[in-house]
From Swiss-Prot:
One of its GO terms (cellular component) is extracellular region. This is Bombinin. It comes from Bombina variegata (Yellow-bellied toad). Keywords: Amidation, Amphibian defense peptide, Antibiotic, Antimicrobial, Cytolysis, Hemolysis, Secreted. Coiled coil: none annotated. It is found in: Secreted.
């Protein structure tokens, strides 16, 4: 439920941060 969505959102945010870090 909400816990799964929260974890998924956190992972998505982390992946986005890593992608932006390597893109620079």
């Amino acid at each position: 439920g909400i816990g799964a969505l929260s974890a998924k959102g956190a992972l998505k945010g982390l992946a986005k941060g890593l992608a932006e870090h390597f893109a620079n």
